[in-house]
């Protein structure tokens, strides 16, 4: 009997009816009674296979493949963020994909870091309900991911070098059956390196079917002066054309903040970072902290990362969905149209089949500025 465990403390004492399993390098098929069998110099079953080693450039490895019915409850991953000073965007070069049942195109496709709300090839602390990133580069996802027939998670190494060590675990439960009205988890990454003036950036489009939108991650690199966050978030639902059904009041409002997140420090206005269960602004930097070069400093365009989870307030649709955000700023002369560098991950659930995603841009085009 299917019983999702995502009910909080209120239902934790109720009997659970799933069969718990885990896939990692120690038990790559999640088999019952076969975890931790690999030997090390310490002896049998003593940490003999803690990770995947030396993933070759261009290789795609299957992290997990399991038969259903079942539901993934948790994914944990950690990996170094660079292999050399010149090859320092591992989190943008690794691509994670997920497939449900018999589909041939992925329902999830994203650079690894961005999927976990860590854009720009850099990690940051994320403290939210469905995503948590903890020291040091401990990436955790708690979105439930049900599947009726089977599930597959792959990792493609588009990095220039071998990945020396990749640690991971996929925790899931098997069930006798799933409800007929179950929907499937999806996530898609996009980027415009320079947005078009007076044209809203598209976070998600082409979605057909019934489902609900559950989250947004945005990695914004500002390329112009002054305040950047007046753009409104728009949800075009079930046939909306020129105008959306839902339109917000500004970017900082969509992420739960107000008045430019500002405070005064030593006579200067600075933006405040924050993490909450359902929305956050966990990352700001105008420096490349991973480099030290004798010929140039570490300055780079300002980078900001935001998340918003529609868990308590899902955006429901019966037929189709499109999600966009404006690029509008404000300066001394009032509102103005901006052109910035915007990347995003959209998270949603929907019935299958789903439309294939547009091809992922090249790794060089994914790199931060």
Predicted region positions:
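Beta-strand-centric surfaces of beta-sandwich/beta-rich domains
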Residues: 1-369
